[in-house]
Amino acid sequence: MMTQKEKHFERKEKVLGQFFTPPEVAKFIVSFSIRHLDHRETNLACDPACGEGIFLRYLKKEGFEVYGFDIDPIVKEVAPPDVRDDIIIMNGLSDLPHEGEYDIVVGNPPFSAKYGRIHDRDTLSKFELSKGRRSQAIEILFLEKFFKCARKGGVIGVILPYGIFSNTNLKYVRDYILRNSQVLAVIALPRNTFYGTSARTAILFAKKGGPHRGKILMACVSSKLHLTLSEIEKLGKIVEPTDSILYPEFYLQESLELKNSIPLGELVEIRSGQTEYGKNRLFSKSGIPFISAKVVTPLGIDFEKDRKFVSPSSKMYKRRAYAFVGEVVFVRVGVGTIGRVAVITSKEEEGIVDDWSYILTLKTNKVNPYYLAFYLQNPIIKKQILKYARGVGTITIPQRELKKIPVVIPPKEFLEKCEWAYKEMVKLRKEGKINEAGRILKEIEREIEDMIKN
């Protein structure tokens, strides 16, 4: 079986377009970079991980002397004839010709999610962002290489995994960016931009020379067709950066400021579910129900979606991950699953919650779990949850961010109505009356929306 690295050098995967940057994306990155270049000092431009040379073509059309670097000899065969001689076969992370002289450095470097991490000590020793580390994500090293290649005042345009802009554990990378450049823009791309992956990506535009001062253009595009200079100006928002937060949703989605609301963290205690992986991930034919993200539905806990059991004597049994009647299970991770909420309404629904979810325990009578479940999965609130989400292929919301969600405190009568409605909804679902259960959900959803808007 071939390793991912070996697959990378297989022409078949290249030809299928696995690593192809769509022309609309490459053309936009080159256009945006040129617009923000103060002057052509050297007239040099490069792509340190050039692949088939799509960026080189657009740079060359604009009159630049171009250099492309790629470790894969195959790219010479698949590159267009007009840039074939401009590609040098060498490791883009090694010392490159004209390093520190390029007016423009653009590209779409490989991501560690596909190729793993760099462990070579000689390579790691050359980069500030890998100092003191046994390994580093390849895209982080390439990001620093883009900075090394650009001259002071040169413009960088690079496609990166979204996590670099949002993950709390990658703040040191954002600090490096802000310390060494004037960030011009961060533009989030649609999930289907690249063939074969739904991982989130964004384009970083920066002018070398820091520290950063001033405002940044933030934008999210829903289609590659919106990647034009005029469209980005319409869609984007010029913002003052907050701390090291560089992901557009934080700035583009307005934070809810709700009257008579309390942060979720003041209403509940939050603990994480737990589980085992590898050889210890063993289920039993009977025992304690296992609550995976699949069973957490808008209509309550539904074990028909994924019926598994945990033996009390196995390593899969986690005492702190046991959810009791009256507690709320909140799915914290996953595209399409994040923000799912369900109340444990009976002893039969109690169980061990896996690590995709949080368990919320009320510490006040200002709300009840039934209202909270309806409230947190309301579309308006789910948008706020997504605003605070982090990650690339698998997004998640940290506890400290979830605790910031404002919760409107309703009248006691509405709390009682939510309790009745939730239990009735679960009952109807168990009886197979899905449409009737759904109508209850929609009715409460509308009432909560009215409460939020008013």
Question: What positions do the PLM features span?
Answer:
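Mobile active-site "lid"/loop adjacent to the S-adenosyl-L-methionine
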Residues: P110-I138
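Conserved beta strand-loop-helix elements of the APE1-like EEP
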Residues: R200-H212
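A short glycine-rich beta-alpha junction/loop motif
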Residues: S198, L204, E350-Y358, A389-E416
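A short beta-sheet element
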Residues: R319-A321, V325-Q377
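Conserved S-adenosyl-L-methionine
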Residues: E13-G107, S112, L160-G163, R179
